[in-house]
Every structure is written in structure tokens, then in C-alpha cells.
């Protein structure tokens, strides 16, 4: 009997010592999950991917670092949206819409593509672009185009150079926009303070995945059922255990 009690105690200790993880975000693509994990690990937060099949990929972190992980995702504006494909914006089998609607969709796609391109500039963490354009089908008196940019950056020493690079990039993108009609607002990245909240003092086992945990739980339930059956049938008395 002592052996069975010891085995059950061992299983309980293993379950208590399992590393507690919490789902940070789900329904991600492989690229989005990799970007999130890269940012988290650069700030000493351990994260892992879990493939959910058709539901996409989820990212899990330890419960003690969940709050810090959420703050980092907000600071870096993660997850980044999927790359915009013009062919997806205008599929060949879609109904023909008005020229006004087609123009609005086109400029919306252009704005998203430009936002993705600006992140490639060194120092830019995330960017939002708004392009003013005339939706009228007959541009008899077309208004001059204006472009506004809000960018979050992490290199304050090169802020002036960053503004110049962004303006030059947008000026070369649109041939009919004037340099003075491009406005750029830079916002410095928030200071990050790492917080690691440990709810309980626990023994961590990196090799214990969810599948292993479920296996141990199943084994524990099976042992309990066998013990109950043995007591009811008098098996221990017959075998003098």
C-alpha cells in the first residue's frame, strides 16, 4: 500500500512542478509568431509556438511574464498585419465596383504597403500613413495631395535624419506630391520595465509539454480507479499487501 501512495505522491509532485504557461495570442501566421517571439526573447521573456492547425499558431509565455509580454506587444505594435497583395484587394472574380470604390481600395492598399516599407527603415518600429486623395470621378479641380505619417522610433539621436529619410522615401513614391505637403510625427518608444510576477514558487520542468501533462493526469486517474476497485473487492487483503 505504501508503494501505491508513494507513486500517487510522485505524480502529484510532477504535476505541481509543471511549468505553468498562458496563451498570449492566437490565430497567427508563422511570420507573425516568429516576430513576436523574437521581440519577447530579446527582452528575456521565454515564449514558444503552438501549432493549432487551421486555427493558426498561438504563442504561449510563462504566467509570471504575461503582463510584460502584453506591454511589449503594445509597444512594438504586434502582431504586424499580413503583407498586402494588390491581387487580393482586386480579385479577378469579384463584382465590378464603381471607380470611386476602386480608387479608395487602391489607396488603402498603398497606405498599408507603405507602412510595411517604412518599418524596414532603421529606427522605425511601427508607422501609420494617411494619404489625402480626391475620390471624385471627375477631377476637374484636383486638390494637392497630402501625406501624414506617425512613426514610433527607438533611436532619438537620429530623429532629424529619420524624418528626412521618411519624407524622401514618400516623395519618390508619389510623383505629384510636394515635399512640404508631407508631415512626419515621430513618437519615441516607451521605456520598458521588465516585471516578472511569480504566483507561486514552483519547480519547473522544461521537458513537460501539455501532452506529457495529460499523460500523467490520465495515469493518475487510472491509478485512483484501480485503488478504489482493489479496496472494494478486497484485493489487498487476499494478497496480504
From Swiss-Prot:
A lipid is attached at residue 18 (N-palmitoyl cysteine). Keywords: Cell outer membrane, Lipoprotein, Membrane, Palmitate, Plasmid, Protein transport, Signal, Transport, Virulence. One of its GO terms (cellular component) is cell outer membrane. InterPro entries: AMP-bd_C_sf, FliF_N_dom, T3SS_SctJ, YscJ/FliF. Pfam families: YscJ_FliF. A lipid is attached at residue 18 (S-diacylglycerol cysteine). It is a lipid-anchor. The keyword Lipoprotein applies. PANTHER family: FLAGELLAR M-RING PROTEIN, SECRETION SYSTEM APPARATUS LIPOPROTEIN SSAJ. NCBIfam families: III_secr_YscJ. Involved in the secretion of the Ipa antigens. This is Lipoprotein MxiJ. It comes from Shigella sonnei.
